[in-house]
Regions:
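N-terminal amphipathic/hydrophobic targeting modules at extreme N-termini
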Residues: 1-14
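Glycine-rich phosphate-binding loops of nucleotide-dependent enzymes
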Residues: 15-311
Length: 311
């Protein structure tokens, strides 16, 4: 289980698109450029995010999408360009973050592929790290654990707030990261390849959580290479290539073939020859219904002689 008993169909339907009549731009980046050691990583990039949308970022490795997100969250500072954020009154104001804490205080959070969690500390301690409630100069442990429950319930973490993070599954740790974002009143949450270490069931539960967050008015920026995810949960998609923004499209108006073409800069044609399976091939390794303390879903697979088995 990822974060409790969120209902999950075997086949998820397309998640609701944003209402075009009420869409509002809450984040805008214009002319963003960034170089490292005189090597241009971002070249005059524009980007816009609307309220309560899931905006997908696509591009090959090194295309610049993660660098842009790190600029938006204050990890890096741009060489050129401007960033604007909704001021809560319907206006866009220019912002400049010199560190992630400043972005956090403005409601922008990012969950990286490598979680920023202390394994030997509790869920509650991780959620409020650096912002612990204090009473008479000391940490108020009872209040911290009680406050943590609010955010844990929202992402449906099925564990007590005093549970050590090291005892959680990868999916549950991801939920702790999202709970941290929510505890800072996040209006924008950036997820960097969030399903790379999740099982199929955990992925679908994550999608349910994303839909729930959108209903709360939270916008999601979702970095992914997985086409099936993009068409399942995305509202819009922005494609990067070689440090440039190539295009932004409504998911409903594009195709997988079109996105691949935008990513690689040319038409893509499948040229793989058909693989014929030998029914008598030799099994060299087999696992059946394997369960561990951290991964409750049974795992089964067979590896055959002379074949590459992807996991």
């Amino acid at each position: 289980m990822i974060c409790g008993q969120l209902e999950s169909d075997h086949r998820l339907s397309k998640y609701s698109l944003r209402d075009e009549k009420v869409k509002k731009t809450i984040l805008k980046a214009t002319g963003i450029s960034k170089s490292f050691s005189h090597v241009p990583i971002l070249k005059n990039v524009d980007f816009e995010l609307d309220s309560a949308e899931t905006h997908i970022l696509m591009g090959e490795n090194g295309a610049g999408k993660s660098t842009l997100m790190k600029i938006i969250t204050g990890v890096y500072q741009q060489d050129k360009g401007n960033i604007y954020l909704d001021d809560g009154k319907g206006n866009l104001e220019e912002i400049a973050f010199s560190n992630p804490k400043m972005a956090l205080e403005k409601g922008i959070s990012m969950v990286f592929q490598e979680f920023n969690l202390m394994e030997n500390m509790t869920i509650a301690e991780n959620i409020f790290m650096g912002y612990e409630p204090v009473k008479k100069g000391l940490i108020d442990w009872n209040k911290m654990n009680q406050d943590a429950l609010k955010w844990m319930e929202m992402v449906e973490i099925d564990a007590p707030p005093t549970e050590l993070v090291e005892n959680l599954s990868t999916a549950q740790k991801q939920c702790v990261e999202i709970a941290k974002c929510l505890s800072h009143n996040a209006k924008i949450i950036i997820l960097d390849e969030p399903t790379s270490s999740l099982s199929e069931r955990e992925v679908r539960t994550l999608f349910k959580l994303i839909a729930k967050l959108k209903k709360e008015g939270i916008s999601i920026i979702y970095i992914s290479h997985r086409m099936e995810e993009i068409f399942e949960i995305g509202d819009r998609v922005t494609v990067f290539r070689d440090g440039e923004k190539i295009d932004t499209l409504n998911i409903k108006d594009t195709t997988e073939q079109k996105l691949i073409q935008l990513m690689i800069g040319r038409e893509f044609k499948e040229n793989y020859s058909e693989y014929k399976i030998d029914e008598n091939r030799e099994i060299v390794l087999e696992a059946e219904n394997v369960i561990t303390s951290k991964y409750k879903d049974p795992i089964s697979f067979k590896a055959y002689k002379g074949e590459i088995t992807g996991i």
